[in-house]
Swiss-Prot record:
GO CC annotation terms, alphabetical: mitochondrial small ribosomal subunit
Organism from which the protein derives: Aspergillus oryzae (strain ATCC 42149 / RIB 40) (Yellow koji mold)
Keywords, comma-separated and alphabetical: Mitochondrion, Ribonucleoprotein, Ribosomal protein
Entry protein name: Small ribosomal subunit protein mS23
Subcellular location: Mitochondrion
Annotated coiled-coil segments of the chain: none
Family: Belongs to the mitochondrion-specific ribosomal protein mS23 family.
Assembly with partners or alone: Component of the mitochondrial small ribosomal subunit.
Annotated region described as Disordered, given as residue ranges: 228-261
UniProt GO MF annotations: structural constituent of ribosome
Length: 261
């Protein structure tokens, strides 16, 4: 068919004919799958549909006695794409992505905390009630702040993004402080009953830093000596005066001293 190559569409027919002709002794296992789900016959590739970001808000409308749920559509700016990127899959975006980016930009060290990503059924989120920040069976982390902020935006009337962020962040700080106090009290009680603890993470880090600094000092001294030797090789060693020259200089100095007197 001219410039179109339909060999890939006829791959099942080709495999069956090769089996009938005796070129192959076994039918491929994907024969039935290709029969049930044949390749697409459309030769024109359509451009991917650009989806809009829809946000749910609870607002008090003029003339209404109660707040009503309003769905806001955020218009996406259409950017011209190159021909090579025209048919790439559409990027999936959620409202939580912007909230998550803002929180971890302000609290980068929260990413260094260990996290448990294992789920039992994959539907653990159904058991969470984000009307409060702390959830049973889930450790407090940055994702808790993001979900709490999103709940405030969706369920509190006339809630703004900055106000919801401040409320969730204030609750997060209070719970973090409570965890630190509980950890310190538990350590003090254990030490009072005779428990001994090893060095803290800060002390271990300082010790590793000191060891690395000592290794660097040894390396720096050796590098400095090598550079000095290379410089001496280019310039040559300084000349050492002979014994006769040194004696002549000393006699000249002794002769000049009486004249000055």
């Amino acid at each position: 068919m001219g410039k179109y190559n339909l060999t890939a569409l006829r791959v099942r027919q080709t495999a069956l004919r090769q089996k009938e002709a005796g070129k192959t002794h076994q039918i491929p296992k994907w024969i039935d799958v290709v029969r049930d789900i044949p390749p697409a016959q459309v030769l024109v590739r359509n451009q991917q549909q650009q989806h809009q970001l829809v946000r749910q808000r609870l607002k008090t409308l003029p003339g209404a006695s109660k707040p009503q749920v309003v769905f806001e559509v955020q218009e996406k700016r259409v950017k011209p794409k190159k021909a090579s990127r025209m048919f790439l899959p559409t990027e999936i975006k959620y409202e939580e992505d912007l909230l998550r980016k803002e929180f971890f930009r302000d609290h980068p060290w929260e990413l260094a905390r260990p996290r448990v990503v294992l789920e039992s059924t994959g539907k653990d989120y159904e058991n969470y009630d984000w009307s409060r920040l702390q959830q049973p069976g889930k450790r407090l982390d940055g994702e808790s702040v993001v979900q709490r902020q999103l709940w405030l935006l969706n369920n509190v009337p006339d809630m703004t993004k900055s106000t919801a962020y401040d409320i969730a962040r204030r609750e997060f700080y209070r719970l973090r402080l409570q965890e630190d106090i509980e950890r310190r009290v538990a350590a003090e009680e254990a030490e009072a009953t005779g428990a001994t603890f090893g060095p803290t993470r800060l002390e271990i880090g300082m010790e590793l830093e000191n060891q690395e600094y000592e290794r660097w000092k040894v390396w720096a001294k050796s590098e400095a000596q090598v550079q000095e030797q290379r410089a001496a090789a280019f310039t040559g060693a300084p000349e050492i005066p002979s014994t006769e020259d040194s004696l002549g200089l000393e006699e000249g100095v002794e002769e000049k001293q009486p004249q000055q007197a």
